[in-house]
Regions:
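Carbohydrate-associated surface elements
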Residues: 4, 24
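Conserved acidic donor-binding segment of nucleotide-sugar-dependent glycosyltransferases
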Residues: 168-169, 173-179, 187-190
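Short alpha-helical donor nucleotide-sugar binding micro-motif in glycosyltransferases
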Residues: 114, 122-128
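Short acidic/histidine- and often glycine-rich active-site loop of Leloir-type glycosyltransferases
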Residues: 20, 158-169, 173-174
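Aromatic "clamp/platform" in nucleotide-sugar-dependent glycosyltransferases that forms part
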Residues: 136
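Nucleotide-activated donor-binding/catalytic signature segment of Leloir-type glycosyltransferases, i.e.
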Residues: 97-115
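Conserved donor-binding/catalytic core segment of Leloir-type glycosyltransferases
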Residues: 47-63, 69-72
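Short hydrophobic beta-strand element within catalytic cores of glycosyltransferases
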Residues: 153-157
Length: 191
């Protein structure tokens, strides 16, 4: 849980005691080997010299996936090269894939589906330059901790529960809840 969850409970009248207990992470703190990186890049035909972003989680619109796709479409339209790994599955998967096609992002997005193998998951986090996690729905994003265990910073919405404890530019990156802000932050990071 998070401090933001407690604040929400207080707003609806909860007056009892509480304990804030952030999510733990069972992924070991590790660096992914050069061989593992090369294997994943070959598997998905990822060029060596492009920024690599990752979204990990359920494929549902209320996680603000549309903001990610709109920001990436802006980057593409500005002539920026990058790849976005979409790792997970969910009820809105087909609609998200349709939006990817509509935005002209098919050549930029790598769809992995659900990955259960923890070592393979480590590899995807490890090759990524940045986790994109603009969800304002999640109370305490486990994926942020998983990415951090692989030395991959996260881009989060300022003021969201997932962003609690993140220092902008030091332990992650913060933006406002908009595609333009995500794009601006990505442009700054890519420079």
């Amino acid at each position: 849980t998070s401090k933001g969850t407690v604040d929400s409970l207080r707003k609806v009248g909860y007056t009892g005691d509480y304990v804030v207990m952030p999510n733990g992470c069972d992924l070991p703190v590790t660096n992914v080997s050069d061989d593992d990186i090369a294997l994943i890049k070959r598997k998905h035909n990822i060029p060596n010299d492009v920024p690599l972003f990752i979204y990990t989680g359920r494929m549902i619109w209320y996680k603000n996936i549309e903001l990610i796709l709109d920001a990436c479409a802006m980057l593409k339209n500005e002539g920026k090269e990058f790849r976005l790994i979409m790792l997970g599955f969910g009820a809105d998967e087909n609609a998200i894939k349709k939006k990817i096609r509509k935005c002209g992002l098919s050549d930029y997005v790598i769809w992995t589906g659900k990955i259960l193998d923890r070592n393979e998951l480590l590899g995807y986090y490890g090759i990524s330059d940045l986790l994109l996690f603009p969800s304002t729905f999640d109370t305490n994003g486990l994926v942020v901790r998983e990415a951090a265990a692989c030395a991959t910073p996260s881009l989060l919405v300022r003021g969201s529960c997932a962003a609690e404890g993140v220092e902008d530019g030091k332990t992650g990156f913060l933006c406002v809840e908009s595609a333009h802000s995500i794009r601006n932050t990505l442009n700054t990071i890519m420079e």
